[in-house]
Amino acid sequence: MDRRRRAGADRFDEVWEGVYHMVPGPSHAHGRIEAHLLALLRKPATDAGLEVTGQFNLGESEHDFRVPDGGLHRAGAGGMWHPTAALVFEIVSPGDESWQKLPFYARHDVDEVLIVDPTERTAAWLALGDGEYRRVERSGLIELGSAELTERLDWP
Protein backbone atom coordinates (compact mmCIF):
# COMPACT_ATOMS: atom_id res chain seq x y z
CA MET A 1 0.00 0.00 0.00
CA ASP A 2 2.88 2.37 0.71
CA ARG A 3 4.18 1.80 -2.82
CA ARG A 4 0.69 2.56 -4.23
CA ARG A 5 0.57 5.76 -2.20
CA ARG A 6 4.06 6.91 -3.25
CA ALA A 7 3.27 6.19 -6.91
CA GLY A 8 -0.05 8.06 -6.70
CA ALA A 9 -1.97 4.90 -7.63
CA ASP A 10 -4.20 5.23 -4.56
CA ARG A 11 -6.08 8.36 -5.75
CA PHE A 12 -9.40 6.52 -6.04
CA ASP A 13 -8.94 4.12 -3.11
CA GLU A 14 -11.48 4.28 -0.29
CA VAL A 15 -11.78 3.18 3.33
CA TRP A 16 -15.06 1.55 4.34
CA GLU A 17 -15.39 1.47 8.14
CA GLY A 18 -11.65 0.87 8.49
CA VAL A 19 -11.40 -1.60 5.57
CA TYR A 20 -9.18 -0.46 2.70
CA HIS A 21 -10.73 -0.79 -0.80
CA MET A 22 -8.27 -0.55 -3.70
CA VAL A 23 -9.90 1.06 -6.71
CA PRO A 24 -8.07 1.24 -10.05
CA GLY A 25 -8.09 4.42 -12.09
CA PRO A 26 -10.90 4.81 -14.62
CA SER A 27 -10.83 3.50 -18.18
CA HIS A 28 -10.82 5.89 -21.14
CA ALA A 29 -14.56 5.32 -21.70
CA HIS A 30 -15.26 6.03 -18.01
CA GLY A 31 -13.22 9.24 -18.16
CA ARG A 32 -15.02 10.34 -21.31
CA ILE A 33 -18.44 9.84 -19.71
CA GLU A 34 -17.24 11.66 -16.58
CA ALA A 35 -16.04 14.69 -18.57
CA HIS A 36 -19.29 14.87 -20.52
CA LEU A 37 -21.38 14.45 -17.37
CA LEU A 38 -19.52 17.31 -15.65
CA ALA A 39 -20.22 19.51 -18.68
CA LEU A 40 -23.93 18.58 -18.80
CA LEU A 41 -24.41 19.22 -15.07
CA ARG A 42 -22.61 22.58 -14.98
CA LYS A 43 -25.38 24.91 -16.24
CA PRO A 44 -28.33 23.42 -14.33
CA ALA A 45 -26.18 23.23 -11.19
CA THR A 46 -25.02 26.83 -11.51
CA ASP A 47 -28.61 27.94 -12.15
CA ALA A 48 -29.58 26.22 -8.88
CA GLY A 49 -26.71 27.82 -6.94
CA LEU A 50 -24.70 24.60 -6.73
CA GLU A 51 -21.07 23.94 -7.59
CA VAL A 52 -19.98 20.99 -9.75
CA THR A 53 -16.81 19.07 -8.87
CA GLY A 54 -15.04 15.93 -9.96
CA GLN A 55 -13.85 13.33 -7.45
CA PHE A 56 -13.81 14.31 -3.78
CA ASN A 57 -13.59 12.67 -0.35
CA LEU A 58 -17.04 12.18 1.16
CA GLY A 59 -16.77 11.36 4.85
CA GLU A 60 -15.37 12.69 8.09
CA SER A 61 -11.82 11.32 7.97
CA GLU A 62 -9.37 8.86 6.44
CA HIS A 63 -10.95 6.08 8.53
CA ASP A 64 -14.26 5.95 6.61
CA PHE A 65 -14.80 7.73 3.31
CA ARG A 66 -15.89 7.22 -0.30
CA VAL A 67 -14.68 8.90 -3.49
CA PRO A 68 -17.59 9.45 -5.90
CA ASP A 69 -16.83 10.32 -9.52
CA GLY A 70 -18.22 13.79 -8.94
CA GLY A 71 -20.90 15.80 -7.24
CA LEU A 72 -22.84 18.97 -6.67
CA HIS A 73 -22.13 21.04 -3.58
CA ARG A 74 -23.87 23.84 -1.75
CA ALA A 75 -22.15 27.15 -1.01
CA GLY A 76 -19.46 26.84 1.64
CA ALA A 77 -18.31 23.33 0.75
CA GLY A 78 -14.58 22.80 0.65
CA GLY A 79 -11.58 21.25 2.29
CA MET A 80 -10.23 17.72 2.22
CA TRP A 81 -13.28 15.99 3.76
CA HIS A 82 -16.86 16.70 2.74
CA PRO A 83 -19.38 15.55 5.37
CA THR A 84 -22.15 15.61 2.74
CA ALA A 85 -23.04 16.75 -0.78
CA ALA A 86 -26.23 17.82 -2.51
CA LEU A 87 -25.67 15.13 -5.16
CA VAL A 88 -23.01 12.55 -5.91
CA PHE A 89 -22.61 10.71 -9.17
CA GLU A 90 -21.05 7.34 -9.81
CA ILE A 91 -20.13 5.88 -13.19
CA VAL A 92 -20.38 2.10 -13.11
CA SER A 93 -17.24 0.20 -14.09
CA PRO A 94 -16.87 -3.59 -14.26
CA GLY A 95 -16.70 -5.00 -10.73
CA ASP A 96 -17.14 -1.67 -8.96
CA GLU A 97 -19.16 -0.99 -5.82
CA SER A 98 -21.28 2.00 -6.85
CA TRP A 99 -24.59 0.52 -5.66
CA GLN A 100 -23.07 -0.69 -2.37
CA LYS A 101 -22.20 2.90 -1.45
CA LEU A 102 -25.86 3.95 -1.10
CA PRO A 103 -26.20 3.24 2.66
CA PHE A 104 -23.06 5.30 3.32
CA TYR A 105 -24.37 8.18 1.22
CA ALA A 106 -27.71 8.01 3.06
CA ARG A 107 -25.95 8.15 6.45
CA HIS A 108 -24.18 11.29 5.21
CA ASP A 109 -27.44 12.92 4.09
CA VAL A 110 -26.55 13.13 0.39
CA ASP A 111 -29.83 14.34 -1.13
CA GLU A 112 -29.49 12.66 -4.52
CA VAL A 113 -27.34 10.00 -6.16
CA LEU A 114 -26.95 9.61 -9.91
CA ILE A 115 -25.61 6.25 -11.10
CA VAL A 116 -24.64 6.15 -14.77
CA ASP A 117 -24.03 2.76 -16.39
CA PRO A 118 -22.19 3.07 -19.74
CA THR A 119 -22.63 -0.63 -20.57
CA GLU A 120 -26.42 -0.48 -20.15
CA ARG A 121 -26.61 3.16 -21.29
CA THR A 122 -28.78 4.05 -18.32
CA ALA A 123 -28.87 6.78 -15.70
CA ALA A 124 -30.58 5.98 -12.40
CA TRP A 125 -31.54 9.13 -10.48
CA LEU A 126 -32.15 8.44 -6.80
CA ALA A 127 -33.53 10.75 -4.11
CA LEU A 128 -33.15 10.30 -0.36
CA GLY A 129 -36.37 9.97 1.64
CA ASP A 130 -36.87 8.44 5.08
CA GLY A 131 -33.25 7.26 5.16
CA GLU A 132 -33.22 5.39 1.86
CA TYR A 133 -32.96 6.10 -1.84
CA ARG A 134 -35.79 5.74 -4.32
CA ARG A 135 -35.71 6.20 -8.08
CA VAL A 136 -37.09 9.48 -9.38
CA GLU A 137 -37.63 10.70 -12.92
CA ARG A 138 -36.22 14.18 -12.30
CA SER A 139 -33.87 15.80 -9.87
CA GLY A 140 -35.36 17.87 -7.08
CA LEU A 141 -32.18 19.97 -7.02
CA ILE A 142 -31.57 20.90 -10.65
CA GLU A 143 -33.58 21.12 -13.86
CA LEU A 144 -32.59 17.74 -15.29
CA GLY A 145 -33.91 14.19 -15.29
CA SER A 146 -32.63 10.73 -16.09
CA ALA A 147 -34.38 10.46 -19.50
CA GLU A 148 -32.98 13.77 -20.74
CA LEU A 149 -29.53 12.98 -19.38
CA THR A 150 -29.52 9.53 -20.98
CA GLU A 151 -30.45 11.08 -24.31
CA ARG A 152 -27.80 13.81 -24.12
CA LEU A 153 -24.84 11.75 -22.87
CA ASP A 154 -22.15 10.91 -25.40
CA TRP A 155 -22.04 7.16 -24.76
CA PRO A 156 -18.87 5.24 -25.65
Mark where each language-model region is.
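Gly/Pro/Ser/Thr-rich low-complexity, intrinsically disordered segments predominantly at protein N-termini
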Residues: 1-156
